[in-house]
């Protein structure tokens, strides 16, 4: 141990134990001490050795503890990925030891917003010093050196930081500020990466929307796998972090409410957790367009789903083709989603593969359910606005063969919900959910009319049997007025 006159027998309370890799196996503690003492007094060095050899040989790594936290950070800044020691092929790796991660800087660092631009670092220190020892205080400044009205304050413990948040967040409005002071934990590197991904995805989706390729559901085939995979990756990361705000900020996901976001994030989390699950069904793919298979199989009825395994399983293979390459999702991963969704219940598949196939079908059904709610906002916004004017709540009929009867609608669905769900297939001239005049509650059925029969047929193909919650939609042509029954 280094017992210099400049330091007591023990290191400072906030000192960091650092792990150091990529050091020569021939180096002794003396050699390492000479290297590290350039940055500050060293309290202790512990070389990791292979005890199976006689005498024990160095593993080429060590732990070092400086007397001060400042010295450790200076050494890390100067050495980590910067300096290559004699005889080594890679630069030194230096980072806090695992035991130090519980007190990582990102867990103690606060962002302070809405502060007066007249405040100095000393003013901020005085303002927050009553909550504990401040390790660092820095005001953000522009190229001109003027304050941007925000700062970072790092305490020595997370408890101190939490106390400061409780006491100071929105506690006062400072001079020249339009709203109260903001005090919160600073964004971590993971938070920053998530925001960057969200911004990137939003830009890509806006470019797609501007291209006006969303005239009907067939336009989904123009959406590249990289966009869908990026969606899945973001969902998985967001679900694992528990932060749904990132999802709700996405333009294409604007049609989802909080509960749907949570369910969709849960599905993605299950996929992420199950990525290492071995599966014998990875060979399931489809020769046709992956997205066309996904959309066409959405129209299968409950009976056809249980008797014919081609559509849902081929669709899962297609989903694997789309997202597997970049997001690591495989068919085995999808099986892990089954527990999060009621799916097809216990009907299963009659191809003899048992519960695995049933789980896969349930998983597909779960994805399908929440993808439906997001679809409308993927379409050109100008088109949506034009269609929605006067269509919701109207009972105007289209030409023969263009009028649909929809049964098994969710109780909470209104005219606007019905309109948005069927707009992707063509120009909707009217969408009406029927209401019981006595109870003022939905009768769970309605009518949708298009301006052409082709759109109506596309809607039937994709939406008949489509699952929303615990219900499967029944979508069929409305009979002509000459028939004795309207449907």
UniProtKB/Swiss-Prot annotation:
GO BP annotations listed: cellular response to polyamine macromolecule; cerebral cortex development; mRNA destabilization; mRNA splice site recognition; negative regulation of cell population proliferation; negative regulation of epithelial cell proliferation; negative regulation of gene expression; positive regulation of gene expression
Residues that bear Phosphothreonine: 4
One protein family per Pfam: RRM_1
Keywords: Acetylation, Activator, Cytoplasm, Isopeptide bond, mRNA processing, mRNA splicing, Nucleus, Phosphoprotein, Repeat, RNA-binding, Ubl conjugation
Domain RRM: start-end pairs: 16-99, 108-188, 402-480
Modified residues (Phosphoserine): 179, 303
Sample GO molecular function, one term: mRNA binding
Keyword Protein biosynthesis: no
Comp. bias (Low complexity): 283-310
UniProt keyword DNA-binding present: no
Cross-link entry Glycyl lysine isopeptide (Lys-Gly) (interchain with G-Cter in SUMO2), positions: 109
Chain segments carrying region Disordered: 277-310
Top-level lineage group: Eukaryota
Modified sites of kind N-acetylmethionine: 1
Gene Ontology CC entries for this record: cytoplasm; cytoplasmic stress granule; male germ cell nucleus; nucleus; perinucleolar compartment; ribonucleoprotein complex
Subcellular location: Nucleus; Cytoplasm
Described purpose of this protein according to its UniProt entry: RNA-binding protein implicated in the regulation of several post-transcriptional events. Involved in pre-mRNA alternative splicing, mRNA translation and stability. Mediates exon inclusion and/or exclusion in pre-mRNA that are subject to tissue-specific and developmentally regulated alternative splicing. Specifically activates exon 5 inclusion of cardiac isoforms of TNNT2 during heart remodeling at the juvenile to adult transition.
Domains: entry comment: RRM1 and RRM2 domains preferentially target UGU(U/G)-rich mRNA elements.
Family named by the database record: Belongs to the CELF/BRUNOL family.
Subunit description: Interacts with HNRNPH1; the interaction in RNA-dependent. Interacts with PARN. Component of an EIF2 complex at least composed of CELF1/CUGBP1, CALR, CALR3, EIF2S1, EIF2S2, HSP90B1 and HSPA5. Associates with polysomes.
Protein name: CUGBP Elav-like family member 1
Lineage, highest ranks first: Eukaryota, Metazoa, Chordata, Craniata, Vertebrata
Gene it is expressed from: Celf1
């Amino acid at each position: 141990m280094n017992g210099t006159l400049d330091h007591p027998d023990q290191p400072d309370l906030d000192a960091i134990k650092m792990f150091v890799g990529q050091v020569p196996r021939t180096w002794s503690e003396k050699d390492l001490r000479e290297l590290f003492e350039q940055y500050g007094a060293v309290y202790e060095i512990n070389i990791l050795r292979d005890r199976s050899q006689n005498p024990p040989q160095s593993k080429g790594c060590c732990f070092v503890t400086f007397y001060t936290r400042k010295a450790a950070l200076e050494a890390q800044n100067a050495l980590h990925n910067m300096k290559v020691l004699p005889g080594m092929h890679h630069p030194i790796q230096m980072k806090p030891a695992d035991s130090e991660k519980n007190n990582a800087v990102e867990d103690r660092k606060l962002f302070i917003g809405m502060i007066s631009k007249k405040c100095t670092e000393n003013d901020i220190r005085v303002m927050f010093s009553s909550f504990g020892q401040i390790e660092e205080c820095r005001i953000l400044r522009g190229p001109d050196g003027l304050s941007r009205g925000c700062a970072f304050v790092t305490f020595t413990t997370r408890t101190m930081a939490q106390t400061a948040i409780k006491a100071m967040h929105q506690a006062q409005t400072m001079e020249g500020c339009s709203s109260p002071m903001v005090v919160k934990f600073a964004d971590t590197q993971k938070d920053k990466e998530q925001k960057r991904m969200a911004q990137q995805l939003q830009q890509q989706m806006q470019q797609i929307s501007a291209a006006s390729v969303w005239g009907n559901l067939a336009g989904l085939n123009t959406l590249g796998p990289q966009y869908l995979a990026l969606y899945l990756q973001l969902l998985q990361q967001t679900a694992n972090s528990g932060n749904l705000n990132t999802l709700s900020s996405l333009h294409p996901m604007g049609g989802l409410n909080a509960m749907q976001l949570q369910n969709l994030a849960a599905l993605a989390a299950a996929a992420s957790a199950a990525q290492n699950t071995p599966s014998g069904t990875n060979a399931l793919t489809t020769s046709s367009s992956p997205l066309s298979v996904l959309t066409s199989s959405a129209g299968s009825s409950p009976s056809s789903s249980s008797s014919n395994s081609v559509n849902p399983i081929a669709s899962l293979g297609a989903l694997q083709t789309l997202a597997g390459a970049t997001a690591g999702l495989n068919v085995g991963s999808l099986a892990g989603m089954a527990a999060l969704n009621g799916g097809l219940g216990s009907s299963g598949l009659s191809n003899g593969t048992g519960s695995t196939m049933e789980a896969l079908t349930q998983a597909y059904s779960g994805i399908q359910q929440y993808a439906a709610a997001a679809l409308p906002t993927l379409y050109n916004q100008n088109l949506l606005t034009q269609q929605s004017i006067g269509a919701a709540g109207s009972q105007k009929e289209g030409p023969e063969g263009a009028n649909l009867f929809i049964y098994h609608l969710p109780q909470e669905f209104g005219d606007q919900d019905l309109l948005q769900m069927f707009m992707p297939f063509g120009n909707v001239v009217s969408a009406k959910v029927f209401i019981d005049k006595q109870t003022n509650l939905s009768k769970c059925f309605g009518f949708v009319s298009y301006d052409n029969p082709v759109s109506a047929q596309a809607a039937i193909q994709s939406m008949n049997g489509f699952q929303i919650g615990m219900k499967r939609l029944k979508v069929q042509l409305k009979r002509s007025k000459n028939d004795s029954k309207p449907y």
